[in-house]
Every structure is written in structure tokens, then in C-alpha cells.
From Swiss-Prot:
InterPro entries: aa-tRNA-synt_IIb (IPR002314), aa-tRNA-synth_II (IPR006195), aa-tRNA-synth_II/BPL/LPL (IPR045864), Ser-tRNA-ligase_type_1 (IPR002317), Ser-tRNA-synth_1_N (IPR015866), SerRS_1_N_sf (IPR042103), SerRS_core (IPR033729), tRNA-bd_arm (IPR010978). L-serine binds at residues 233-235, 287, 385. This is Serine--tRNA ligase. It comes from Synechococcus sp. (strain RCC307). Residues 110-134 are annotated as: Disordered. Belongs to the class-II aminoacyl-tRNA synthetase family. Type-1 seryl-tRNA synthetase subfamily. Its main location: cytoplasm.
């Protein structure tokens, strides 16, 4: 959430920075609500001060010998009661305006970092680096073709169980998924991450804190009878792990690695990636999350991205890093790197991780502060996939395919899977 002080002191900056995202925002209504709230706060404060003075006058009169039931004392007490009633009315009006202002502010995305490249769409994203040699070949198959021949997952039966865009992993497919999850969590634990297994049902406050609500409600699955949603990413529960808390500066940075199933409606993706593991309603992911000091967030962003890249390099998967332009960044992000893995069967790079620094945007929405010296201030949050499991499996299948129909697995994964190759079942 954006800082209300910025709205008051420099609304032009908000308009300018949101314009870099391609948004035209009229802040007039927001400014009016904010001014009304400040005016009410001033009125309430003045009335409370007057009420305090009235109370002191009553005390001085009685101390000076006036009877508690004298007309003068009664008049002052009646005045004090009227002031209390007026203050109560103003407090309710103030709460209503606060709620209105918060509702409006929650709908605005984060301001992009000054370092984020300008642009309108993914076509303006900037390639930062490449790693590995992309495999080329006319006869290379896509992962869903390989998986079908190897018997790694069921699609048609999954539609019967649920609906389209669900799969059931079978045999070596299920074992490979489990191996990848364990491998990733173990690798991240060596880099100082604390492993977390959070709830996958989260409440509205958690989704609001991370930035999914109110804007993206239609993209999430909601329980009909409770204020609970299936989490679209572990970023949501990890953000709220320290909601409404003050953390000692000595504890920072806090680094978490969490495996969760993730659930997304994928609204607007009709007809795209209808086969295989790329775009599903339910998928598994290992998420990396940092709470850090504001002065360390740029350094933390680079390290978080390197930690996600370390998984790809250990699995010998060629990839590239892109820096997203201002028009293509996510709602909560101030700056983002996307990692795209090479899929030789498809002949293209596909996103497998998005690593973002959110500044104090999520911390303000979730009231997460740190204590340094005598005061407290908002910390910074960062998140990134480390990695999406299904897309990693797709990349392993396409990059490891052999002429005999088997799949060669990378050496780092063999201790977890138990074999060097996948062969037709």
C-alpha cells in the first residue's frame, strides 16, 4: 500500500510513477477523502483538548471550595458530556473515512523503482544474462509428448476427477515431483533459508497483505462457507507470517523457503498452454521469501535471484534472466527479474521464476515493522520462485530427452530420484 503522507505531500509523484506503469490515475477523490479525514482528526483533537480543559476546570472549582452539585460545576460537567458525545460522533465519521481511504489505496499498485527499465509490455523487458547452451534440434519433442510416452501423468482421468487444467502425476512422474521438491528445499537450506510449510488455506487479510486482494479476487479459488481462500502462491502466507509484528533489527534478514501446492483460476488464459504442465489450476512450487532492512533490499534482491538461478544451474538447465519493464511488473513489485528456462522441444524460453523486491509496499499493508534504536519503521519484503516444480519437470524432460526415448536426469537429482534415467513404463 502506498504511503498516505506521499498522497498528501507529493501526489504528483504518485501520478508520475504510476504513469510509468501505463496507468492514468485521477487522485482527486483520494486527496479529498484524505483531506476530510485530516480535518476531522483536527476537529476531534481540538474537542478532546477542550474536554480536557473542561475537566480540569471542574477539578479546580471543587478544589477551590465549590460544591460538586453547584450550578457552575453542573454546567461544566454537562459541557464535558456534550464534548464526549461530539468526539464519539467524529471518531465514527473518521473511521468511515479511514476505511474509504484504505479501500482506495489498496487498489493502487506499488510504485516502480527508479532502476526499473521503462516500457509498456513484455516486449520492452531487458535481457540481463544467459547461462548454458540452448539445445537445438528438429526432432525434439515437447514435454507433454514425452510424458505421455513415459506414463508420467494422467490428463483425461484428471478431467473426470476435477475439470480441465488439472493433472494426476503417476509413477515416475510423482516420484520426480517429490524428488524435485526435496532437492530444492535442501539446496536452499544450505544458503541459510529456514524451511516453512504454511497453511494453504489463507484468509482475506493475508491475501490483502500480500497484494492479491482486492484486485485479483477473480483469479483465486474461494471457500463458499468461510473467509478462506486456496493460496495462489506461498508468498501470501509467508508475508502474513509476521503480520502485525515488530521484529528486532538484529533478526534481519529473515529468509524462508516454503513448499506449497498453489491454486489459480488462470482467468484470461483460455486456449493457451492447454497441454502438459505449463499452465494448471493446481501446481507445486517452492517459494523464497525475505524480510530485510530497507538499506539492504537491493543487495537482497540480487542474492534472492542468484539463489533461484542456483537451482537451474545445479539441474543443468539453460536459462536467461530478464529485468521486467515498468509496464510488465506485478502489482506489488517495485522491481522484478524473471528467470526463463529453455524448452528445446517447444523451441522457446518460458518463465520459471519471478524474483521481486516490493519495498515497504507489503509491509505497510501487513503492518510489519522492525525496531532499531528507539523507534520502529517498515521493513522491506522480497519474494521469488525457487522454483515452480511442474515447469522444472517440463524443462528436465525436454532438455534430457535421448534418441532411445529415455530421459537423462542431471547428476544433482540422482540421489533424490534413485536413477539416472527415466524410461518408458
Amino acid at each position: 500500500m502506498l504511503d498516505q503522507r506521499l498522497l498528501r505531500d507529493n501526489p504528483e509523484l504518485i501520478s508520475q510513477q504510476l504513469g510509468r506503469r501505463g496507468m492514468e490515475v485521477d487522485l482527486t477523490k483520494l486527496q479529498l477523502i484524505a483531506k476530510q479525514e485530516r480535518d476531522l482528526e483536527e476537529q476531534r483533537s481540538n474537542l478532546q483538548a477542550e474536554g480536557n480543559r473542561t475537566g480540569k476546570e471542574v477539578g479546580m472549582l471543587i478544589k477551590g471550595g465549590a460544591a460538586p452539585d453547584s450550578d457552575e460545576v453542573k454546567a461544566l460537567r454537562e459541557k464535558g458530556n456534550r464534548i464526549k458525545q461530539q468526539v464519539a460522533v467524529l471518531e465514527e465519521e473518521e473511521k468511515g473515512l479511514e476505511a474509504k481511504l484504505r479501500e482506495q489505496l489498496l487498489a493502487l499498485p506499488n510504485l516502480p523503482s527508479a532502476d526499473a527499465p521503462e516500457g509498456k509490455s513484455e516486449a520492452d523487458n531487458v535481457e540481463v544474462k544467459r547461462w548454458g547452451e540452448p539445445r537445438q534440434g528438429k526432432d525434439l519433442e515437447e514435454h507433454w509428448q514425452l510424458a505421455d510416452r513415459l506414463g508420467l501423468f494422467e490428463t483425461e482421468r484428471s478431467v473426470r476427477i476435477a475439470q480441465s487444467r488439472f493433472i494426476t502425476l503417476m509413477g515416475d512422474g510423482a516420484r520426480l515431483e517429490r524428488a524435485l521438491i526435496s532437492f530444492m528445499l535442501d539446496l536452499h537450506s544450505t544458503k541459510g533459508y529456514t524451511e516453512v510449510m504454511p497453511p494453504i488455506l489463507v484468509n482475506s487479510a493475508s491475501l490483502t497483505g500480500s497484494g492479491q486482494l482486492p484486485k485479483f479476487a477473480e483469479e483465486s479459488f474461494r471457500c463458499a462457507d468461510d473467509d478462506l481462500w486456496l493460496t495462489p502462491t506461498a508468498e501470501v502466507p509467508l508475508t502474513s507470517l509476521h503480520r502485525d509484528e515488530v521484529i528486532a533489527v538484529e533478526q534481519l534478514p529473515l529468509k524462508y523457503a516454503a513448499y506449497t501446492p498453489c491454486f489459480r483460476r488462470e482467468a484470461g488464459s483460455y486456449g493457451r498452454d492447454t497441454r502438459g504442465l505449463i499452465r494448471l489450476h493446481q501446481f507445486n512450487k517452492v517459494e523464497l521469501y525475505w524480510f530485510c532492512h530497507p538499506e539492504k533490499s537491493a543487495e537482497a534482491h540480487e542474492q534472492l535471484t542468484l539463489d533461484a538461478e542456483a537451482v537451474l544451474e545445479a539441474l543443468e538447465l539453460p536459462y536467461r534472466r530478464l529485468e521486467l519493464c515498468t509496464g510488465d511488473m506485478g502489482f506489488s513489485a517495485a522491481r522484478t527479474y524473471d528467470l526463463e528456462v529453455w524448452l528445446p522441444g517447444a523451441g522457446s524460453y518460458r518463465e520459471i521464476s519471478s524474483c521481486s523486491t516490493c519495498g515497504d509496499f507489503q509491509a505497510r499493508r501487513s503492518a510489519i515493522r522492525f525496531k532499531e534504536g528507539k523507534g520502529t519503521q517498515l521493513l522491506h519484503t522480497l519474494n521469488g520462485s525457487g522454483l515452480a516444480i511442474g515447469r522444472t519437470m517440463a524443462a528436465l524432460l525436454e532438455n534430457g530427452q535421448q534418441p532411445d526415448g529415455s530421459i537423462q536426469l542431471p547428476a544433482a537429482l540422482v540421489p533424490y530420484f534413485g536413477r539416472e534415467r527415466l524410461t518408458p513404463q
